[in-house]
């Protein structure tokens, strides 16, 4: 399904938080949405792997990597694992690598930057805790909507199906 964060903001602006514009799209799906599972880790992707091994249908993995530009938390192997387990997308407050392979995958991936250096895999970090970056506090189970324009979150699901009347009002 396609999501348009601009249209969603036009309708639901008082119900959503808008993440500061710092992310770029690295995955094969330009838009994605779902309930978030949070991970807080720094230059270590062990917990990320454990989480992506779970069923991700309807879910987005939101990773607070401390904004690190030194090591990539997501690579092609982890993205393939996410795709295999039906995750809707991954948002990384940090870096990714193997970007040519990532853009061929049927999963949404947004991150700050890319770097060829991989992360360690010791499993250090925390899962399903509130995290804060981009001017927004993300709570486990919040709903996240992302496209090439930006990322927004809501405590409640938003209708992506705009009726004709609503579409006419937006024009």
Swiss-Prot record:
The keyword Zinc-finger does not apply. One of its GO terms (cellular component) is cytoplasm. GO terms for molecular function: endoribonuclease inhibitor activity; enzyme binding. Keywords: Cytoplasm. One of its GO terms (biological process) is regulation of RNA metabolic process. InterPro entries: RraA, RraA/RraA-like, RraA/RraA-like_sf, RraA_gpbac. It is found in: Cytoplasm. Its main location: cytoplasm. Homotrimer. Binds to both RNA-binding sites in the C-terminal region of Rne and to RhlB. Globally modulates RNA abundance by binding to RNase E (Rne) and regulating its endonucleolytic activity. Can modulate Rne action in a substrate-dependent manner by altering the composition of the degradosome. Modulates RNA-binding and helicase activities of the degradosome. Belongs to the RraA family. This is Regulator of ribonuclease activity A. It comes from Vibrio cholerae serotype O1 (strain ATCC 39315 / El Tor Inaba N16961). The gene is rraA.
């Amino acid at each position: 399904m396609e999501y348009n964060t601009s249209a969603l903001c036009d309708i639901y602006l008082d119900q959503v938080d808008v993440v500061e514009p710092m992310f770029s799209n690295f995955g094969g799906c330009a838009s994605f949405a779902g309930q978030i599972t949070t991970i807080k880790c720094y230059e270590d992707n062990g917990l990320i792997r454990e989480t992506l091994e779970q069923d991700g249908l309807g879910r987005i993995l939101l990773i607070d990597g401390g904004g690190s530009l030194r090591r990539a938390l997501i690579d092609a192997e982890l993205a393939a694992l996410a795709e295999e387990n039906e995750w809707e997308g991954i948002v990384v407050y940090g870096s990714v690598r193997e970007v040519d392979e990532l853009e061929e995958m049927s999963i949404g991936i947004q991150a700050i930057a890319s770097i060829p250096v991989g992360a360690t895999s010791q499993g250090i970090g925390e899962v399903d805790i509130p995290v804060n970056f981009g001017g927004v506090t993300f709570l486990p189970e919040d709903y996240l909507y992302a496209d090439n324009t930006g990322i927004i979150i809501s405590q409640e699901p938003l209708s992506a199906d705009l009726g004709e009347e609503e579409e006419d009002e937006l024009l």
